[in-house]
Amino acid sequence: MISLCMIVRNEEQNLENCLKNIKNKIDEIVIVDTGSTDKTIEIAKKYTDKVFKFKWCDDFAAARNYSVERAKNDWILVLDADEAVDFFNKEALDKFINLNGKQLGRIKIINTLEDAGGKKQLTERVSRIFNKKYFKYYGMIHEQIVPINEVNYKISDVDIIVNHIGYEKDVVNSKGKIARNKELLQKAILENPRDSYLYYQLGKTFFMAKDYEKAEMNFENALKLGVNEKYEYAEDLIESYGYTLINLKKYKEALALEKYEAAYKNIADFNFVMALIYMNNANFKEAVMKFEHCKTSTECKIEGTNSYLADYNIGVIYECLGFADEAVKHYKACKNYSLALNRLKLLHKL
């Protein structure tokens, strides 16, 4: 038996889609509203009678834990209102929750991004399933699931896929949200000045706002405090730091990321950012080798880093070096990627 626990506020545009996709897959729905002024509560009551109000106190973990406390089941699944279940393997979930409760379950979340090359997907594995006897939420913002009483625990992937339908809107149009996140994270850091995760999240917030100098400072603070490479956020911290240095044109400084090679040598996203760093340092041979290595990975977080984005950048390198035929071969391997199609048109090969 498992309960879905959600915290919501002014989510009338998203909540119905989320709940109708999950209602027949779980045993209980618990919804905590933190101050909606729209029809969110009305929509929630169509799907469950366990709808509660929580006075907002600038603490996401407090709201999450309040929702968990009101669940009748020990096993908890957490979703946000702008997430909709795309695939749900009930058999895999049942098998997971019938094991030892001292484990976290990670689900796959697919976000849609948009840049100059068009839309692409960002895939994350995020811990969202836990037993409330052994775990709780911690952190006023970007809250994390943490063990109670320092129990030893495992992290396992559960075969559930969720589409985050609000990601693009969040990133592009959420200046108010970014400002709120900055304020809460800075407040949290004052209380926990040696928490590398908080510096990482503040760095991500500045990165989202394209304030790369402040992003760099906070990513460096996180790394200086020491990051266990087994932490879920460690890889993204290192890769985001790499992209920050590229945006700041600090290409030589970015070569310092080579020291993480041993930990992430088979990760497409890490190899991709390293390839970009080599490319911007005019080390084209190493860059091509890294891009080619990206294509050997079966999985990636950012869509295309193990396929068409790698081929596109190899094509750019060959074109710059005067090897037009090789460039064309790699551009054509990109299929319908718009930037590659543009290069083929300019080379009169389309």
At which residue positions do the language-model features occur?
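Catalytic-site signature of metal-activated, phosphate-bearing donor transferases
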Residues: 62-68, 79, 85-210, 214-217
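Short aromatic/hydrophobic "clamp" motif used to bind/position activated sugar donors
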Residues: 76
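A conserved acidic beta->alpha catalytic loop
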Residues: 21, 33-42, 56, 80-83
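Acidic helix N-cap motif at the loop->helix transition within catalytic regions
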Residues: 16, 38-47, 88-89
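Short, well-formed alpha-helical segments that are part of the catalytic scaffolds
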Residues: 5-25
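Conserved donor nucleotide-binding strand/loop of the catalytic core
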Residues: 27, 42-66, 70
